[in-house]
Regions:
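Active-site catalytic motif of lipid deacylating hydrolases and related acyltransferases
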Residues: 5-16, 22-94, 187
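Short amphipathic alpha-helical surface micro-motifs
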Residues: 19-23, 136-139
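Serine-dependent carboxylesterase/thioesterase catalytic core
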Residues: 38, 64, 84-171
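Lipolytic serine-hydrolase domain surface
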Residues: 42-46, 54-58, 144-218
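Stable alpha-helical elements in mature extracytoplasmic
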Residues: 56, 60, 79, 83, ...
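Hydrophobic, Leu/Ile/Phe/Ala-enriched alpha-helical segments that form helix-helix packing faces
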Residues: 60-68, 87, 115, 119, ...
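Surface-exposed patches in mature extracellular/periplasmic domains of secreted proteins
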Residues: 70-77, 120-125, 213-217
Length: 218
């Protein structure tokens, strides 16, 4: 007589459990958070003197350095090629912020164009991705270069009355990028000490997001 009674052996024998290995319980790798890298270019007549003549920017440097996941590196404006080299070494997901005062502001536009001298664009390096650029009264006006879509967003504190022997008053222009121009009216020397501008800059650094990879880098 056939029997169709349920048996424990039949039930348990029909289920195959996956073998467990040490890898099964391996800890998950921590997710790396994108870091914000601020490249701060000082002013100065001869570049090297910017450590003294741009002292007001060191207050901004200190305020930015204490923000979470923010790293600040400061350069003389003549070292702008080093900024290009340092940006090229970053992890692709990190956030790039370039800030420049006076001559450092003008040279920041060179950084954005991959330009370091010679014939442009023939001798230029590939344009770096820049998520945020902030220029404090860039100078001289004739040294400014238009920026392109590799810069996600830029802010220029344009000085209408720099009163500094023809220096200051640089205007930032560009193609296929967002530029916010904030007009100011103060002596060129005092711009670096303007706490209102610094507070705005700090807020922008806190809020900046990464530029996507769809820009036409050249």
């Amino acid at each position: 007589q056939d029997s169709y009674a349920y048996t424990e052996a039949e039930a348990t024998g029909s289920i195959g459990l996956p073998s467990q290995t040490p890898e099964t319980f391996a800890p998950l790798q921590p997710i790396r958070m994108a870091k914000k890298h601020v490249y701060l270019l000082l002013g100065g007549i001869e570049s090297w003197d910017g450590w003294a003549t741009s002292a007001g920017m060191f207050g901004l440097q200190s305020s930015l350095a204490v923000l979470p996941d923010v790293e600040v590196t400061t350069y003389e404006w003549a070292s702008f090629k080093k900024v290009l080299d340092d940006i090229a070494l970053l992890p692709k997901d990190d956030i790039v912020i370039v800030i420049g005062y006076s001559g450092g502001g003008a040279k920041a536009t060179w950084v954005a164009n991959g330009y370091f001298g010679g014939s442009y664009p023939k001798d230029a390096l590939p344009r770096p991705r820049i998520d945020l650029m902030i220029l404090y009264d860039p100078s001289p006006t004739w040294s400014m270069m238009p920026i392109q879509d590799n810069v996600k967003r830029a802010i220029c504190y344009r000085n209408i009355t720099p009163l500094f022997f023809g220096l200051g008053g640089g205007v930032l222009v560009g193609n296929n990028t967002q530029i916010d121009t904030i007009d100011i009216f103060e002596h060129h020397w005092l711009v670096q000490m303007d706490s209102t501008l610094h507070q705005r800059t700090i807020k922008e650094v806190k809020n900046v997001q990464r530029l996507g990879d769809g820009y036409a880098a050249q």
